[in-house]
UniProtKB/Swiss-Prot annotation:
Binding site for ATP: 10-18, 33
Assembly with partners or alone: Interacts with Pkn1.
SMART domains: S_TKc
Residue spans crossing the bilayer: none
Entry's EC annotation: 2.7.11.1
UniProt xrefs under CDD domains: STKc_PknB_like
Role: Together with the serine/threonine kinase Pkn1, may play a role in the specific interactions with host proteins during intracellular growth. Autophosphorylates and also phosphorylates Pkn1.
Catalytic activity from the UniProt record: L-seryl-[protein] + ATP = O-phospho-L-seryl-[protein] + ADP + H(+); L-threonyl-[protein] + ATP = O-phospho-L-threonyl-[protein] + ADP + H(+)
Phylogenetic classification of the source organism: Bacteria, Pseudomonadati, Chlamydiota, Chlamydiia, Chlamydiales
Pfam family, one: Pkinase
Keywords: ATP-binding, Kinase, Nucleotide-binding, Phosphoprotein, Serine/threonine-protein kinase, Transferase
Protein name as catalogued: Serine/threonine-protein kinase PknD
Species assigned in the record: Chlamydia trachomatis serovar D (strain ATCC VR-885 / DSM 19411 / UW-3/Cx)
GO molecular function terms listed in the Swiss-Prot or TrEMBL record: ATP binding; protein serine kinase activity; protein serine/threonine kinase activity
Length: 934
């Protein structure tokens, strides 16, 4: 030990002594632990001491002091480690024992709130050593060191051992099985060197009776430490060495120290950890830590506020039969069915838990749970707020989350076929709703504002199948949001009072989340107030300017998007959301914007289908994980007709996959949303995907986005010598694509002979794309002969299958030239009227144009009146016979608007309408934006 100079003794344990020492070689202070002189001759204890050092040296964790060196030469047996300034957990607990009044500092240090993070760090360290196969076997406050700078470390590894080690077997007196019922056990607070390893006060009952140590014996010791942290007292009150009956003396922490305001379930956690029977304890440290997480995160403690009996009318303010469609109009259940509707007499708080069980048969036709704002509920407006719809079909449970009558989330899961009843738990807290079925999380939804529902409603057919409903509210959260007060005012629509408190919170916490959250909610409060009381909604924009460039910057744009949404400025709404998502992509508040996008998608599906495809595209691009597989199937059904009417989907027979670049291109095409086209082009080029590149050129060209078309042409020319597409893509070369690009430019410049020569060198798909781009321009400019010439040049060498794609253009030219005989023959042969024609098909429109040329306007109107979708594209084209349709165009997607204008122009020409009428549609088409934002 010549290298070390001992300064002073700083600790003494069962086997060793710890000194503060000076390391002369490194010129630093270290902690030196050596075996006690009176035990140095004991070979077993000497071996255990060295094992302690080696175990500590093998473990690397912030909660374990690393070992610098180990010495076992001659009589000197010691090891060194860093010296950590601090104090033991025992000394902190001892400082408050038997004190009636604590200083403010000591009260804060020993509060439940302060102790729990320390305990979690201790558990994290023990969880780590268990993962390495090590048991500590002597966990106690004396062996927990609290550093001056926040360190929490476990010391004294003298009793530690690897599980299943031979030494563990040698230390046991008896390997026989032991029963734990009513044993008299002797306790002591000192580690006993010898056969019994550990400190009896902190040893599990089975360890004192000679049973092999395990993870659960360490869990027991941790439970005692937690008990002391909660109560500031030890669970046993007896003299040293006295025998006592364990089961008779341990009081739950909540009873031991009622003044400490210990949440009941936290008290139960401690009692479970120190259960007399190991089987009743936590199965692992991980399970113990998971049980503590709600308290570490400040989640609430729940207490039952009311119990509602489904068949007891006195529990309900409103109890009547209703038709389902009034409350859940979007659901598949028959709206003609009658259900029992109950509205709770008791009001529920902002943080509420609803628990009940229900039979499978009771929800066969569905049941609903509603969270309704009081004022709306009083007026009978039961469709406001949030609702949940549960249904079981074919052993599959489906849960739908409804907001203001709109289904915004849906999840299904198979159930155990024999299961006849299941437990449901719903937690509504602040801006969060969580649904648990059989203790498993089923749905989680986070809104951008607190949920305002404070009445509980129930819709069900079979009252016999539903248990009583327990309504609990939070009482024991370790932290309560300062926003709770203004949120309560907002829920009651006391806007002025809410605004006052939001401003106070904003000014009281500068630079913190509470500040920007308060400002955001202030903005939404003002917006809601203006909307309800009347006024200019854009006045609320300035309240969100306060968030600009600060910690909550994305919320500025979310708030402004809300203003534009309610003001009907869809393009500006999208601009705001895109700006925030692009500029602050890594910001922790971005998930709130993603959730808002999801809500807007589902909302627009029921209100503005023209907007829904834009939100679908944004979610696919930014947060595809938000859409479940079942929702994918639903969305594919919604866009099926548009897929059938899309040329590049007709050419490629492969099914359109929802999560694919082609779907993103499809949505970009229909919405005119060209922002993502450059990235799609780059992606397709990187994959050497010839067909995808051709599709992107087509979308840019047919939508009139000349800037994007030329940008892609330049990019393609720059790599034309570097890329050759593989054999699997028909061995097409970049040169062919360049011929196509130049051919389209020649058509645009009306150099038709050059265009024909260039397009002759391209495959049929590219010729078809060029033809489709040119045909609208030709009809609008009334240059039909040039179009017919190009059409014939492409038609003649084409195969029969390829000619089918060209047929509609041929019919159009016959109709334009009043060649009714040829037009009728082609229409009747290929698309006979006696067959059911899809109204979204091009043939349906062409039949309408043919009937218009026969001169019978009544027949034309009758033809278009067959449309099921009264404000769909085909129906609107029919409406132009008697009047203008411009006021209806907002119901259509961007590309539908363009095609409706063109086909209305074409129909009016066929009807021999005055130039003044059809010219309006021609000019409207030409003046329409080339893309979403122009």
């Amino acid at each position: 030990m010549q290298r070390y100079e001992l300064i002073r003794l700083i600790g003494k344990g069962g086997m060793g002594e710890v000194y503060l020492a000076h390391d002369k070689a490194c010129s630093r202070r270290v902690a030196l632990k050596r075996i006690r002189e009176d035990l140095s001759g004991n070979a077993l204890l000497r071996q255990r001491f060295l094992r302690e050092a080696k175990i500590a040296a093998d473990l690397i964790h912030p909660g374990i002091v690393p070992v610098y060196s180990i010495c076992s030469d001659g009589e000197a047996v010691y090891y060194t480690m860093p010296y950590i300034e601090g104090f033991s957990l025992k000394s902190l607990l001892k400082s408050v024992w038997q004190k009636e009044v604590l200083s403010k500092e000591l009260e804060e240090k020993t509060s439940v709130k302060s102790f729990l993070p320390i305990f979690d760090k201790i558990c994290a360290t023990v969880e780590y050593i268990h993962s390495k196969g090590v048991l500590h076997r002597d966990l106690k406050p004396d062996n927990i060191l609290l550093g001056l700078f926040g360190e929490v470390v476990i010391i004294d590894w003298g009793a530690a051992i690897f599980k299943h080690a031979k030494e563990l077997k040698l230390e046991q007196d008896d390997e026989a099985a032991v029963s734990f019922d009513e044993r008299n056990i002797c306790y002591s607070s000192m580690t006993i060197p010898g056969k019994i390893v550990g400190t009896p006060d902190y040893m599990a009952p089975e360890s004192l009776l000679g049973v092999e140590a395990s993870e659960k014996t360490d869990i027991y010791a941790l439970g005692l430490i937690l008990y002391q942290m909660l109560t500031l007292a030890f669970p046993y009150r007896r003299k040293k060495g006295r025998k006592l009956s364990y089961r008779d003396v341990v009081l739950p922490p909540i009873e031991m120290s009622p003044y400490r305001e210990i949440p009941p379930s936290l008290s139960q956690i401690a009692m479970k950890a120190i259960a007399i029977n190991p089987a009743d304890r936590f199965s692992s440290i991980q399970e113990l830590r998971q049980a503590l997480q709600p308290y570490l995160q400040g989640d609430p403690e729940w207490t039952v506020k009311a119990t509602l009996m489904a068949k007891e009318k006195s529990c309900w303010k409103y109890y009547d039969p209703i038709l389902l469609s009034r409350y859940f109009p979007v659901l598949a259940s028959s709206p003609a069915q009658w259900y029992n509707f109950m509205l709770s007499e008791v009001e529920i708080s902002a943080s509420t838990r609803v628990e009940y069980t229900v039979t499978k048969s009771a929800v066969h036709e569905g049941m609903g749970i509603l969270f309704l704002p009081s004022k709306e509920a009083e007026r009978g407006e039961f469709y406001c707020g949030y609702g949940l719809w549960f249904s079981v079909q074919n052993h599959e449970l489906t849960v739908s989350l409804i907001k203001n009558g709109i289904e915004i989330q849906k999840k299904s899961q198979e159930m155990i076929s024999q299961q006849s009843r299941f437990a449901i738990l719903i937690e509504k807290s602040d801006n969060r709703i969580a649904v648990f079925v059989e203790q498993a999380l089923f749905i989680l939804h986070i809104d951008y504002l607190p949920s305002l529902g404070n009445r509980l409603g129930v819709i069900i057919q079979d009252l016999q199948g539903m248990s009583n409903i327990a309504i609990s509210e939070s009482i024991g959260a370790l932290r309560v949001s300062c926003l709770a007060v203004p949120d309560a005012f907002l829920s009651e629509k006391l806007y002025d009072q809410a605004a006052i408190f939001y401003r106070k919170i904003r000014d009281s916490f500068p630079g913190r989340k509470e500040s920007y959250e308060a400002q955001f909610r202030l903005g939404v409060t003002l917006l809601t107030q203006i909307e309800e009381q009347g006024g200019d909604l854009t006045q609320a924009l300035s309240s969100f300017d306060y968030l600009h460039g600060g910690a909550g910057a994305p919320l500025e744009y979310l708030g402004k998007a809300l203003v534009y949404q309610r003001n009907g400025s869809f393009v500006e709404e999208i601009r705001c959301l895109l700006f925030a998502l692009k500029r602050y992509s890594q910001h922790p508040e971005i998930p709130r914007l993603e959730d808002h996008l999801c809500f807007r998608l589902y909302d627009s599906l029921h209100k503005h289908r023209s907007e829904a495809l834009v939100f679908m595209l944004l979610i696919l691009w930014i947060a595809p994980e938000k859409i479940s597989v079942r929702e994918e199937e639903r969305f594919l059904r919604i866009i099926y007709h548009k897929q059938q009417a899309t040329l590049f989907c007709q050419v490629d027979k492969a099914p359109l996959q929802f999560r694919s670049s082609k779907m993103e291109l499809f949505l970009s095409f229909w919405t005119g949303f060209s922002l993502f086209l450059p990235e799609l082009f780059r992606r397709a080029g990187g994959l050497r995907d010839y067909q995808a590149l051709a599709d992107i050129f087509y979308v840019a060209g047919v939508s009139g986005n000349r800037e994007a078309f030329m940008q892609f042409s330049t990019a393609l020319a720059n790599v034309s010598d570097e890329i050759t597409f593989p054999e699997s893509l028909h061995n097409q070369k970049v040169a062919e694509l360049m011929f196509f690009v130049k051919g389209v430019e020649a058509l645009r410049n009306k150099d038709y002979q050059k265009a024909k020569k260039l397009l002759w060198k391209t495959p049929f798909t590219l010729q078809l794309y060029a033809l489709d781009m040119f045909h609208i321009q030709a009809f609008l400019d009334e240059e039909i002969e040039s179009f017919i010439d190009l059409l014939q040049a492409i038609y003649d060498p084409a195969s029969e299958e390829e000619r089918d794609h060209i047929l509609v253009y041929i019919i159009q030219t016959h109709l334009w030239n009043r060649d009714l005989e040829r037009a009728y023959k082609l229409l009747n042969d290929r698309f006979p009227l006696d067959e059911e024609l899809a109204e979204y098909s091009e043939a349906f429109i062409l039949w309408g144009c043919y009937l218009a040329l026969t001169g019978d306007r009544v027949v034309v109107k009758a033809h278009f009146s067959r449309c099921r979708y009264k404000y769909g594209k085909s129906a609107l084209i029919g409406k132009c016979v008697d009047g203008d349709i411009f006021d209806y165009l907002d119901n259509l997607v961007w590309w539908e608007k363009k095609m409706t204008l063109f086909q209305s122009y074409f129909l009016l020409r066929c009807l021999n309408e005055s130039p003044r009428r059809y010219e309006k549609y021609r000019q409207a088409y030409l003046s329409m934006e080339n893309n979403f934002f122009d």
